[in-house]
């Protein structure tokens, strides 16, 4: 199944969770922090402005991004976890 985000929404695949702490302690899945990095999988057409024009998206598929730990809505499609968020919830693109 393919997902196509609408308007200024972005579909992101979260980076894998860290299983070992900085001190070398193995963390169970429930104790590991949600990573705030991911890869953009798909982007919408852009935000519709009041004058009827669309603002071009600043990110594209394949970009690595930083975002808040509790940003967006989590969905599971074909056994894969994704986050759907608005473009303005993205903090930065990792270059």
Curated annotation (Swiss-Prot):
The protein's name: Co-chaperonin GroES
UniProt cross-references to Gene3D superfamilies, sorted A to Z: GroES chaperonin
Subcellular localization(s) per the UniProt record: Cytoplasm
SMART domains named among the record's database cross-references: Cpn10
GO MF annotation terms: ATP binding; metal ion binding; protein folding chaperone; protein-folding chaperone binding; unfolded protein binding
GO process terms (BP): chaperone cofactor-dependent protein refolding
Superkingdom field: Bacteria
Major location category of this protein: cytoplasm
Cytoplasm is among the record's keywords: yes
Entry's family note: Belongs to the GroES chaperonin family.
Function: Together with the chaperonin GroEL, plays an essential role in assisting protein folding. The GroEL-GroES system forms a nano-cage that allows encapsulation of the non-native substrate proteins and provides a physical environment optimized to promote and accelerate protein folding. GroES binds to the apical surface of the GroEL ring, thereby capping the opening of the GroEL channel.
Assembly, per entry: Heptamer of 7 subunits arranged in a ring. Interacts with the chaperonin GroEL.
Record bears the keyword Cytoplasm: yes
Lineage of source species: Bacteria, Pseudomonadati, Pseudomonadota, Gammaproteobacteria, Cardiobacteriales
């Amino acid at each position: 199944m393919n997902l196509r985000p609408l308007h200024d929404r972005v579909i992101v695949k979260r980076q894998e969770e860290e299983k070992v702490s900085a001190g070398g302690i193995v963390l169970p899945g429930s104790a590991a922090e949600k990573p705030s990095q991911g890869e953009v999988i798909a982007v919408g057409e852009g935000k519709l402005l009041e004058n009827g024009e669309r603002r071009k998206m600043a990110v594209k598929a394949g970009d690595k991004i930083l975002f808040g730990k509790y940003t967006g809505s989590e969905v599971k499609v074909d056994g894969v976890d994704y986050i759907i968020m608005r473009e303005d919830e993205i903090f930065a693109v990792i270059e």
